């Protein structure tokens, strides 16, 4: 039994499922999760000392790579002054100013502790500001585990939501409308059915929780126009895409302006931070200047703020945005070319510092329904072949991969060498 297997057994005795977030349990790919002891740069090291090229990056935050010296020194310096004060600090102002500078649609921002908290608070604010109850989200998009957003589509193309988890009351979920990602007509139908009831539309601009699905041309702009027409707020969830698809977020890359934006992951530099922000008029509707309540014991934590400041200041440096995109493109095109050589049907989506691998005979993957038709068994085999060779991909066919600025061309070359071997071991037949 490996050390990881021993630890996983111990963990299952005291932690539900042995993990503190479900995808880490390797249920999607099978086998025993790898327990990590340390990380540096583009690499993670398991408890037995094996090194892996890491394309998970703590699920997105480690855009500079692990243990970046600028972040580490900033955190250690601030930690000497105290871990948490529960008061305003200059650091939270500095991070807020940085965010507003980099994301022009954000005129004011409120710090929270996670992406879930950010989306939950933004939804509450939208409901309070518009005095409407219903919200509209998209099938396959994930916005955290708050009750309003753990909702799936029911039968038919347009439906009131049904809970996707026990513990979410149907009476609560019925206020959530679920539409098809990249299908603007389904959204138009919803607005026509509930013209004065929808408080907001919330969307992942790049859907990173059904792997990596890019928006079709004019989809995001179409959502913006519909929200304008019906008086609903448009919320872009940039928890995953913020500062990663582009320095100004996916909204900058796709040239669309939301009313509210949610952030997380990258803005904490590896520390637990979330944020939501937008137009000043809307943000001033939140307490203490407005009636919509939101609070948090550790919001604006000085150590987390210092990590976020250091991270964003590094990202701002000339050439970093372009280099991140270049590395991602090299990996994505390399994987596609190798798959073609081995006669394995593969779609690779990518943008900025995100990518997604789909084993499928489809020409493109632009929707949830197309994503779930992909060959999950083949992905799982590929995942384990890569893991054996020291390449750590997301342990699920429905999670995006993440590039970091610590990755090098040599890392990409090593990854492609491993993929060549992995593809050779896969049969190119039996696709559904």
Curated annotation (Swiss-Prot):
SUPFAM superfamilies: PLP-dependent transferases. One of its GO terms (biological process) is protoporphyrinogen IX biosynthetic process. It is found in: Cytoplasm. The modification N6-(pyridoxal phosphate)lysine is found at residue 265. Pathway: Porphyrin-containing compound metabolism; protoporphyrin-IX biosynthesis; 5-aminolevulinate from L-glutamyl-tRNA(Glu): step 2/2. GO terms for cellular component: cytoplasm. Its EC number is 5.4.3.8. One of its GO terms (molecular function) is pyridoxal phosphate binding. Belongs to the class-III pyridoxal-phosphate-dependent aminotransferase family. HemL subfamily. This is Glutamate-1-semialdehyde 2,1-aminomutase. It comes from Histophilus somni (strain 2336) (Haemophilus somnus). The gene is hemL.
